[in-house]
Amino acid sequence: MDIGDMRRDFESEGLDREHLNEDPVQQFQTWFEDARTAGILEPNAMSLATTGADGMPDLRTVLLKYFDSQGFVFYTNYGSRKAQELQENPRAALLFPWIGLNRQVRIQGAVEKVSKAESLRYFSSRPRGSQIGAWVSEQSQVITSRGLLEQKVAEMKRKFSSGEIPLPSFWGGYRVVPERIEFWQGRPSRLHDRFEYVREGDGWTIQRLQP
């Protein structure tokens, strides 16, 4: 199917160097709040790219759950495919596609596990059904039917029928520690504005990139 004629021009205000915060995480927070205020559906949804030992790129959508100057945090099963790839190659890229604002943010960096205390704090805040789900799913493993999954849910509900549900030892968070962050603003005629922050020691350099 030829879809080459699917296009639209971007009618966005420009992004200039003087409008940028010197700290890319502060700049990200500004844009994140813009996306949330604009009603972007799940503005914390991000594409997570990883590569394992075989060199084959992998990609999936996950949810950002916390960010600060130390990095960007998401949670998953430590037995999942993404976790295996991060063990083999602890580097990743993130993409926030805020299409409704003609914006996107790309982040590249090293990846580390968060502390057990951080994982427990977030796990304890999750709805009970999601906590059960974390115990049930052997993420990325083959299962022969949906019925088996629902059977495991029923078993876990009986097991944890009262009291708090403990944090699984195989579940927790990762932090992407940024080394590069790019802010992209769509402009007319595909002459977009792109600014890249590159970590230099304890600070950042900012440079404009050609579209």
UniProtKB/Swiss-Prot annotation:
The keyword Acyltransferase does not apply. Binds 1 FMN per subunit. Pfam families: PNP_phzG_C, PNPOx_N. Keywords: Flavoprotein, FMN, Oxidoreductase, Pyridoxine biosynthesis. Substrate binds at K65, Y122, R126, S130, R190, L191, H192. Its cofactor is FMN. Its EC number is 1.4.3.5. InterPro entries: Pyridox_Oxase (IPR000659), Pyridox_Oxase_CS (IPR019740), Pyridox_Oxase_N (IPR011576), Pyridoxamine_oxidase_dimer_C (IPR019576), Split_barrel_FMN-bd (IPR012349). Gene3D superfamilies: Electron Transport, Fmn-binding Protein, Chain A. FMN binds at residues 60-65, 75-76, 81-82, 104, 139-140, 184, 194. Pathway: Cofactor metabolism; pyridoxal 5'-phosphate salvage; pyridoxal 5'-phosphate from pyridoxamine 5'-phosphate: step 1/1; Cofactor metabolism; pyridoxal 5'-phosphate salvage; pyridoxal 5'-phosphate from pyridoxine 5'-phosphate: step 1/1. GO terms for molecular function: FMN binding; pyridoxamine phosphate oxidase activity. GO terms for biological process: pyridoxine biosynthetic process. SUPFAM superfamilies: FMN-binding split barrel (SSF50475). It catalyses: pyridoxamine 5'-phosphate + O2 + H2O = pyridoxal 5'-phosphate + H2O2 + NH4(+); pyridoxine 5'-phosphate + O2 = pyridoxal 5'-phosphate + H2O2. PANTHER family: PYRIDOXINE-5'-PHOSPHATE OXIDASE, PYRIDOXINE-5-PHOSPHATE OXIDASE. Belongs to the pyridoxamine 5'-phosphate oxidase family. Homodimer. Catalyzes the oxidation of either pyridoxine 5'-phosphate (PNP) or pyridoxamine 5'-phosphate (PMP) into pyridoxal 5'-phosphate (PLP). This is Pyridoxine/pyridoxamine 5'-phosphate oxidase. It comes from Marinobacter nauticus (strain ATCC 700491 / DSM 11845 / VT8).
